[in-house]
């Protein structure tokens, strides 16, 4: 069984990813369209894909579409610094296809099996987001399968409404089949400065300052994120791409990246290859591998290196979901209720970050948490007023409440609490997640929709585009072949 698991996972190291070419792409699109048109018109459809990075349920009543021919890189143009990519291509493959050219996507989400199409329709952030925004902001053009069964090409000049409203639509408007994206030149190494903080106020001020100036202590910063262990212990990691060769750390073996950040005071320095920097969080799924014992030194020595990756930990999570292993073997014998999963990425402004962190660490024992600043990419304000339906929104990307020139701090926490954490008389049912939603709303924030959400329709509309999701859906999916945005992200359709 272990041999099969290893065989079914690709190496954690780089592999050669040759372009699939346009002929194979057209064949993949034809296969997708045949599967779409084979589904009765009164039945809903979804992608029949092997991977998912969503932490919410979904209905099994939809017919799966065949996307097996749409998971590659079509071509890379090193002169124009662009790539033509199929929607189901993972970032792991995309990075391995572009790095040999000295190029990489502007923003690479943290986990290897996130797909380019998924990151664009479902958002994604990483340490370059304070400079380069979100993954969809470096998209030049998309082909999208809509609910009518048509492949619609959209860009800043063509079908602009769909181009602006597709990000954060989570498949409610269709699926990206092809994406043409910009790439950035990148150097082979990354120097890290890991700065220790002892209070949330100075942490938040520094996040805001570096996000605006792109420098720290007069040195340019290319990547910025952070980890908070407690109110007295937090770190910001300032990354700088460099050509300078030298020794590098390897966190795919015995050492654990987030633990390496911890030091008493001042600045710790580290160096990684650019590929290891891109995937520094995937090896231990940030820190979530500890739930499976993978950070225990004895276990780590025998844990196959090839299985130190988020996609394998996901398989373990799915086993637990299917058979309720933790509940049946640990909690139920002790008379304890089921645990409440608390997996969220919320966003607040820097001035509200200290209050949220103070509250969160008092309200739960969950630690550590991840910090990642976001600013929309420069020039994106030109999209405002573009299109017909989308022109009604002051946001460049109307289904997500970010504005140009404003810094937001993504706060990620991925753990759980006891089922009776909030109310012993009413365990479970998302109680603590609802409390978090209320606190974030109180602070004028919002959250990503990849996990459970409990907003009322009215609250949801205030945050995620008002009636625009329904208005664009009436054009691209008049027969409702895909679930609506609220239906999909809150009602788990």
Residue spans of the language-model regions?
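Intrinsically disordered, low-structural-confidence terminal and linker regions
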Residues: 1-24
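Glycine-rich N-terminal segment of FAD-binding domains in flavoprotein oxidoreductases
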Residues: 19-113, 117-128, 371, 440
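A short glycine-rich, hydrophobically flanked beta-strand micro-motif that places a catalytic Asp/Glu
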Residues: 46-47, 222-229, 341, 346, ...
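A glycine-rich phosphate-binding loop feature that marks nucleotide/adenosyl-phosphate handling sites
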Residues: 49-56, 227-233, 318-322, 373-388, ...
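Short glycine/threonine-rich loop-to-helix capping motif typified by GTGT followed
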Residues: 60, 235-248, 310-321, 333-334, ...
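C-terminal substrate-binding/cap subdomain adjacent to the FAD-binding core in PCMH-type
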Residues: 121, 140-355, 362-365
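Activity-critical C-terminal alpha-helical subdomain
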Residues: 323-331, 420-421, 428-493
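Extended C-terminal subregions enriched in glycine
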Residues: 348-354, 358-363, 367, 409-410, ...
